[in-house]
């Protein structure tokens, strides 16, 4: 089985995915696992420490403010969100997962949405 876990933002999103990946590998050592998160999110370090492969999709949070710096940030976030869809689909085409598991955080949105769009099993 080939599984993508997508998560990020906090250890509360990442650690359940790591636990599930470990369980799946324990039951079937041939399970291929890929984690997908953001380029510089804390999830990258946690996944590396656990020994799993990692791919990144640029996505950012939106700020709920009308201040100029928040507006600039949101413009950047909107651009990243627009680019994240094609990047997520490219990862899906290359890895060819049987299942995509999203455990939360804004980093999981592009991968789960792409899985839905191309008809991949997802949770």
Regions found by a protein language model. Give the residues of each.
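Short helix-capping segments at alpha-helix termini
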Residues: 25-30, 117-119
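An aromatic- and histidine-rich active-site surface loop
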Residues: 41-45, 100-117
